[in-house]
């Protein structure tokens, strides 16, 4: 006689085998097996599909994140390409298209001879302030009402650079020489002008301003002329 535990295990195995055999017979002898509805896929198929779709979505999300990640390091060639693309996208005048010189505030107008067409910031601002329906006319009028003839010194940061660039584009032709006087007003304008408008060939300073931060900035690229 089998022990009780062994007998129970044997009965369990036997019953399981009989159930599987009977289930197989019912499936084999059924003449019209019930087809699953098209919208009722087997659970394992659903799981597989969810897995595939989830993987695709995740992969695309990773790609998206990868594209939007800020790049913190560049090789020398990559950096050169970035700078090249920035210049192609932003600079209004390509190098050599205009010969641009600048005379900071305080330079004697007697030094302006034979340096090309004179461009004054006040003249530039007045051109667009008096232009009907210009998008900057209301702002320039408000500033003129508030500050009078000194309103050019009180323009929003960067606006004077943009207006001068626009004025040069509207009035100059390729190969022209221009001297922008009483400019830049600060270091920010100096950097913005060369980054977005044009490379500067020379910057004129009086002797007292030779040690200014602005002069030192232009000295790093050998563009300073002391008068």
Curated annotation (Swiss-Prot):
Sorted alphabetically, the keyword list is: Membrane, Mitochondrion, Transit peptide, Transmembrane, Transmembrane helix
Q: State the source organism's domain of life.
A: Eukaryota
Instruction: Mark the transmembrane ranges.
Output: 41-57
GO CC annotations on file: mitochondrial membrane
Annotated localization: Mitochondrion membrane
Tell me if Membrane is a UniProt keyword of this record.
yes
ATP-binding among keywords: no
The residue span given for the transit peptide is: 1-35
Per the record, membrane topology reads:
Single-pass membrane protein
Q: What is its main location?
A: mitochondrion
Question: Coiled-coil region(s) at which residues?
Answer: none
Similarity annotation:
Belongs to the AIM36 family.
**Identification of the protein by name:** Altered inheritance of mitochondria protein 36, mitochondrial
The record lists the organism as Lachancea thermotolerans (strain ATCC 56472 / CBS 6340 / NRRL Y-8284)
